[in-house]
């Protein structure tokens, strides 16, 4: 069967059989109410687009049709579209049809996300409710302050970045990994979702399911660092993470251990972005440079490239606005959100 048109077999009989084994109910994923709630979330900010306008206008008919197709196993996801972005780096992004996004949102919000997040460490900050870049930056700043109170300025930081995080993910590893964290029904659906993505190695970031896989993929490493290596000051945001410790040799040991763990997942650290340095040096994390002064004060400054990126994006958006291909409101919203992200 063509992976692009793979059928997601989730008949009501299958759902009933799994009710005995799991807390996830099929109605919580493909029921009308679940799909309606998902639609309300998916249409935010995109209702003006022509590609979604028809579906939103005929939402009741379309939701009933989707519910029926999902129940009898005739639902087929449409072929995704691909496009390139150049900022902050050149990469290909996959975009799925609005109709399919509704099912994906319902599946993730009502089944996958609640199950995988139960086992995550508190200092894993990516793509989770109540977390994000702002809270991650605040947490990292608090880490540095607390480190100073206990160790002074004598310490080191191991900054790490994974080379090609999503593109290099091992599909077989991901399938086996997810099975360990979810119930049988959710596992059946997530396996179908993984098979839907084209290619044999890696994933294309641009879909909620893959983002959730990205949250979970390094969970084993997270627990190893926190519980086996007992490094208190460890924080991760997707594939960027930092470890603070007073002993440089211990961080070198941790570096080797991390490389070994990643090797079992066919991943590797980016040598250009992975290094150990004194804690008083500038430590880069999530678009900011952190500097610990002798007095214990922590100075956080926006990285110059982050400002350059924002200026370029606003310039492109304004050019599209002048050509009537973009609304001026979108530029204002982006500027306000970017400005707000600088406050912490």
Task: List each model region and its residues.
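Right-hand nucleic-acid polymerase module
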Residues: 3-6, 96-97, 101, 105, ...
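Reverse-transcriptase-like RNA-dependent polymerase core
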Residues: 69-89, 102, 183-196
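Active-site-proximal segment of RNA-dependent polymerases
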Residues: 2-7, 13-17, 21-25, 110-167
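Conserved polymerase palm-domain catalytic core
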Residues: 62, 69, 138-238, 242-259, ...
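Conserved pre-motif C helix in the palm subdomain of viral-like polymerases
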Residues: 90-121, 199-226
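Short Gly/Ser/Thr- and Asp/Glu-enriched loop/turn motifs at secondary-structure junctions
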Residues: 80, 235-239, 271-272
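Glycine-/proline-rich flexible loop or hinge segments
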Residues: 41-53, 83-94, 121-123
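Non-catalytic, polymerase-adjacent accessory regions of viral genome-replication enzymes
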Residues: 1-64
């Amino acid at each position: 069967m063509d992976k692009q048109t793979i059928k997601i077999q989730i008949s009501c009989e299958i759902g009933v059989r799994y009710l005995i084994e799991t807390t996830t109910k099929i109605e919580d994923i493909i029921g009308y109410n679940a799909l309606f709630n998902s639609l309300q979330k998916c249409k935010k900010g995109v209702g003006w687009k022509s590609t979604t306008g028809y579906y939103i206008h005929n939402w009741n008919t379309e939701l009933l049709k989707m519910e029926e197709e999902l129940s009898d196993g005739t639902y087929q996801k449409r072929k995704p579209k691909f496009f390139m972005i150049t900022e902050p780096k050149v990469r290909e992004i996959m975009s799925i049809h609005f109709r399919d996004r509704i099912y994906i949102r319902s599946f993730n919000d009502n089944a996958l996300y609640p199950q995988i997040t139960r086992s995550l460490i508190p200092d894993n900050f990516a793509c989770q409710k109540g977390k994000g870049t702002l809270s991650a930056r605040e947490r990292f700043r608090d880490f540095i302050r607390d480190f100073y109170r206990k160790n002074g300025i004598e310490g080191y930081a191991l900054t790490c970045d994974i080379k090609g995080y999503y593109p290099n993910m091992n599909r077989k590893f991901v399938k086996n990994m997810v099975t360990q964290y979810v119930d049988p029904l959710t596992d059946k659906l997530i396996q179908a979702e993984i098979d839907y993505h084209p290619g044999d190695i890696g994933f294309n970031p641009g879909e909620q399911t893959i983002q959730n896989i990205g949250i979970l993929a390094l969970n084993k490493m997270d627990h190893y660092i926190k519980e086996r290596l007992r490094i208190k000051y460890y924080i991760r945001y997707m594939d960027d993470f930092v470890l603070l410790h007073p002993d440089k040799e211990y961080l070198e040991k941790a570096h080797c251990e991390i490389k070994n763990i990643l090797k079992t997942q066919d991943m590797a650290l980016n040598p250009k972005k992975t290094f150990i340095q004194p804690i008083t040096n500038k430590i880069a994390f999530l678009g900011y440079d952190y500097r610990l002064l002798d007095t214990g004060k922590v100075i956080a400054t926006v990285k110059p490239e982050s400002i350059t990126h924002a200026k370029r994006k606003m310039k492109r958006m304004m050019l599209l606005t002048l050509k009537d291909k973009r609304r001026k409101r979108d530029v204002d919203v982006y500027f306000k959100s970017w400005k707000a992200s600088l406050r912490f």
